């Protein structure tokens, strides 16, 4: 893939940086693996906003992605690599030897025609999925399960990966890109390699309208509002907050940790680095 900087033919094109997609499938997606996706627009059944900054956006179908990779011992051939509007990563359509087709998260450097395998006996090769107990220490992995059989939950976005550091008893230690080291059960599955589309982070949207196409509405600063709308609002002319930063409901919103999940606290070996 390559990055293209657009010519400044208009103010909206001047800052645009795109990632090329020549290698992606240019036809329609595989229809049996599509599901309708209804726009909630951040509203509940009463029409009240429950999540701010959401609404509008381009309509698209949901691609059913196989995060479990549980067809063990059956070879799957990569038929094509596709764009998925629901995620930053690309997806690959694979056809198993028994004729079933599934979408998977495309790993880096995956080529059309490659053969993938799942299961404990699968070779250590990019795109193959194995239990962590069968993966060599030091390997780069992605699409990692948190519970055996629950499907991948960690390292699924474009360019994401983690590193298998060690195995101790029934748990392995995995280091995330953030620097956090976490214990994961050795029966959980992971896929070898990194997620494709690693240049996604270099993309620049160029104009506000692209965010609207994505279903993201503007974020208004509290100091620009009236006092009835936000604790930071009001004042004559341009004024500051006049207090510690808070959200529209008066809760402190800067400078403290928000994680509070004692149930899984013991699984974290070391916290992420700031």
Swiss-Prot record:
Biased composition regions of type Basic and acidic residues, renumbered to the chain: 229-246
Annotated spans, Disordered: 223-274
One Gene Ontology MF term: transferase activity
A single BP term in Gene Ontology: cytoplasmic translation
S-S bonds: none
InterPro entries found in the cross-reference section: NA-bd_OB-fold (IPR012340), Rib_uL2_dom2 (IPR014722), Ribosomal_uL2 (IPR002171), Ribosomal_uL2_bac/org-type (IPR005880), Ribosomal_uL2_C (IPR022669), Ribosomal_uL2_CS (IPR022671), Ribosomal_uL2_dom3 (IPR014726), Ribosomal_uL2_RNA-bd_dom (IPR022666)
GO terms under cellular component: large ribosomal subunit
Residue runs in coiled coils: none
Keyword terms of this UniProt record: Ribonucleoprotein, Ribosomal protein, RNA-binding, rRNA-binding
Pfam families for the chain: Ribosomal_L2, Ribosomal_L2_C
Matches recorded under PANTHER family: LARGE RIBOSOMAL SUBUNIT PROTEIN UL2M, RIBOSOMAL PROTEIN L2
Job of this protein: One of the primary rRNA binding proteins. Required for association of the 30S and 50S subunits to form the 70S ribosome, for tRNA binding and peptide bond formation. It has been suggested to have peptidyltransferase activity; this is somewhat controversial. Makes several contacts with the 16S rRNA in the 70S ribosome.
Assembly description: Part of the 50S ribosomal subunit. Forms a bridge to the 30S subunit in the 70S ribosome.
Family from the record: Belongs to the universal ribosomal protein uL2 family.
Name used for this protein in its record: Large ribosomal subunit protein uL2
Gene field: rplB
